[in-house]
Amino acid sequence: MAGLLNFTWILALSIFALSLSAQAESVTDWGDVGRWKIRVDEDAGNGCFMETTVEDGTMIRFGYVPNRNGGFFAIYNSAWTDIVAGEKAKVTLEFDAKQFTGDAGNDARGGMPGGYAFFNNPNVRDEFSRSRTMIIFDENGHRIEVDLSGTSKAVQSVEACQKKQAE
């Protein structure tokens, strides 16, 4: 491993925000790139993000939060019933060459528990885009390995989407 990069994950959700997740999201579809859906979240300042669901039913989201000048990574799975809303957990994203570790706020989307982390380190996006594999694990024993094939093109599409939002 080329090194451990620690950066600040900013706890993105409060109890209030968790209650909002039960309401309908203000999200619209923008396009598709391979297995990734490109979407726009009005509540995040028209932030574009990519979303996919992998084999075990885990939903992964990655994108921009323009009204906070950063990005986010979120992951949800209906089997993770031990995740307690409002708490936070230490999460590590391990890419081909680097690791990023920080706190993620527990969240829920569509009835699925999971976590959401805001980041302002562009290296996270760069590694997500260029790596072939990502392993996500937390201090509670949740672990998932994700094939990132085709992700670079999806990240480019998210960036194009974000540029269109600024017009």
Task: Kindly give the residue locations of the regions a language model identified.
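Bacterial N-terminal signal peptides
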Residues: 8-19
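N-terminal secretory signal peptides that target proteins for export/translocation
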Residues: 1-5
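A generic "folded-domain core" signal
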Residues: 23-167
